[in-house]
Amino acid sequence: MLIVYTPTARAAVGPYSEAVKPNGFALTAGQPGLDPLAGATVATDVANQTSQALANTRLILNAAGSSAKSIVKATIYVTDLQLFADVNRAYAEFLAQEGVSEPPARAIAEVSTLP
């Protein structure tokens, strides 16, 4: 099993790997909308935070020798489901930019807080 770390994405802030690659599958850890260089949230709006989280995920997938075209399942956590439409727009833009024609399975859930 390959353990994936990349200096271009936000470093893990706890005892976990950015991604692991068992048997050819790349499984990534959750990615917040933080700029990996500044270590801070990119913006207060959820669309830009979603775009940054997906950009971070792209960096980790690339470091694992994978891409967005190989994503089979995504789980998205938001603090308010009223943000659903903004998240969807940013997510759809990401998939289009990555050349993904058939979106992966996905779940979205509201949580009380995010780290």
Region roles according to the model:
Residues 1-73, 78-115:
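N-terminal presequence-like segments and the immediate start of the first folded domain
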